[in-house]
């Protein structure tokens, strides 16, 4: 039965189809200009950039220039890169220009498509950022596409790890800047820790195109970028806590894999209480007394480290370090650390060096970083499943771009086995059969551990020549993937999301040339060898096509349909044939966590024998339903986290804007006076409450506050004795005295130095208090969730208390700044330190440690008028001895050293 919605779509087409149809008409208009542009000389084509910029200066819009700018970029791509963007790429380019997300299948040319809107938007000169997932892709795309932009007179920069500030500033000043999401985010945070505008590297955030947009804006949305500084070393404590976990029995804790939580049961709590008491780390009577909050936090981290985090799946141990593995891509993330002590708990678990805990100095999530851009767009092979999230959080519409050629890949139904062992036996059989007929195979696994287990099985079965691609061998990644389309190739890979390199049937020409001809100079010999490699690849491609194209064999389903679709999408690029199939077992994580018990019982009733699979579209639908549930739950988590982060983000914006204003101010006299007056008002209202009787006034406290905060000694006791004096009069007199002292100081310092001092004190104080405030917000966030049990909305509680903390921070800022400015003085140059006398060479007795002193000491110190020659000293009168060295024999004649005799009394 066809639903009404389905029937309407058949008659009128979906909204996606209608939108594509409109854009296709515009693409045809651009194609109609192609002949005109083909007739232009290189110089005429290059002159178009200046022509477009002049039109923009006269008030024309980018939209009005789009057809000609796209036609220019297309023609330049043909001449410089030897590639012509298809009409579907023009459609994708328009989506990117119009703040959308272009979902484009793998191999359809996303990188080339992006050049069209990049060129158009770079004409404004405000900067365009092309964001990729790793340094390799950023550098590769900047080099390849940079030739096109340079031809058209635009500058291109690349931001990657290891650049200094000058190099970064130059790259951001370019018309087009390629870089990774991490580098861009960290540069923003670092800029907001600088003290002068000239030190900053980024320009205002104008336009960004995010490649693999789902990976960056969804998968990594929960991961904040944090710049931190080390705290004290507590490695002994982490190691102690870690010893408590391995002896625990299953009854001592509960693990919820769905929610990814681990907690102690009542029995377990009693056990760890006894262990803590024995170790002297339990305060009070119960583990849950307020004094033990930090200990409970560390215990929970240790339990999570042991029971929720698996080595070679969630992290690997390399060079005495814990390196996190991206759960979506299988990539290592060196330098990335879990916060709040979890990373240290993992280090203790694996017995590697425990790095000190860090204090957050600055942080931001990708969600809030990318929402700062005036214009944001993205491209990916898979985004439709997350269209709701892109719309709700980023205001981005997802448009599926049709393929240039029809997709010929066959997506087979999943094969489900009862046990993991049966599943792997079936996988090995299938790999052997496909390998023997020369079909290239890409095997997708969900973890390093599983990819290596499968590799070991293939070795035992005598299948040779396979490649393993996972986080351990990140460096060879691009080359391995580039050759995965060669006939008979078997490539085992952890999740392929965001890999960024196409698998071309027959092999990748560019990669082979780079690998095989790196030492062959330009010339006829090199050209001949390139022609030979081309012919070889063409031959290999024919063989791969004859064998059925690339076979994507997945060993497990991921929580996200999008990751599964990305893996499938590696096959069948640009109209090539191919096939994909998922092999599952009821013991797989997704099946086990989401109700495989019912399915297991049903399969047993059906009489499923060992090594027999069930294949049915119903299974696929059931799995898709489970995945949708997980995706919906993860979306809710991200949405909820964003609501909390938005509170911090609003405060972050206020602080960062204040810092920028401070950098630009040339005279801070009024700002500081305002802060000083507010401090005085707060001081007076605290000690002399409004309308309170004089007996209730705390005059002694007020005098102390004036001394500590304003560095003034004012006769407030005398003022208090005056008749009819009110709090306003106190305020006015204190303000007058403080303003006078500040004005005198400004007169002594001079305006330039005073402004510099004020700026330095305000910004340093602001940074220190902001860091403390971030810690307070983290603590508030960790406890506010429990308010839900008291029927109070945790988010509203967080908003209210975070605002109060912010107000307190600003009040503290005023006090700290004014207190320091009222005390600061210019210190004259310190006198040069006196030169030490040359050391005298003394003979030391090796057996007694005594030295030949007497006259040598005198010779050494004769410049000092406090030294009296030994012959002039009266043993009975210490006043005649002058200055005596501590190691000199005591002048009293005891035979002891001075330090052990009369010198002991000094």
UniProtKB/Swiss-Prot annotation:
- One GO biological process from the UniProt record? protein targeting
Give the reaction(s) catalysed: ATP + H2O + cellular proteinSide 1 = ADP + phosphate + cellular proteinSide 2
Query: CDD domains annotated for this entry?
Result: DEXDc_SecA, SF2_C_secA
Q: Could you state one GO cellular component term attached to this entry?
A: cytosol
Entry-linked Pfam families = P-loop_SecA, SEC-C, SecA_DEAD, SecA_PP_bind, SecA_SW
One GO term in the molecular function aspect is: ATP binding
Keyword Translocase included in the entry's annotation: yes
Identify the keywords attached in UniProt to this record, alphabetized: ATP-binding, Cell inner membrane, Cell membrane, Cytoplasm, Membrane, Metal-binding, Nucleotide-binding, Protein transport, Translocase, Translocation, Transport, Zinc
How and how many cofactors are bound, per the record note? May bind 1 zinc ion per subunit.
Q: Which domain of life is it from?
A: Bacteria
Main function: Part of the Sec protein translocase complex. Interacts with the SecYEG preprotein conducting channel. Has a central role in coupling the hydrolysis of ATP to the transfer of proteins into and across the cell membrane, serving both as a receptor for the preprotein-SecB complex and as an ATP-driven molecular motor driving the stepwise translocation of polypeptide chains across the membrane.
**Assembly state and interactors?**
Monomer and homodimer. Part of the essential Sec protein translocation apparatus which comprises SecA, SecYEG and auxiliary proteins SecDF-YajC and YidC.
Q: Report the family membership.
A: Belongs to the SecA family.
Q: Which NCBIfam families match?
A: PRK12904.1 (NF009538), secA (TIGR00963)
The name this protein carries in UniProt is Protein translocase subunit SecA
What organism, scientifically named, is this protein from? Brucella suis biovar 1 (strain 1330)
Classification from the root reads:
Bacteria, Pseudomonadati, Pseudomonadota, Alphaproteobacteria, Hyphomicrobiales
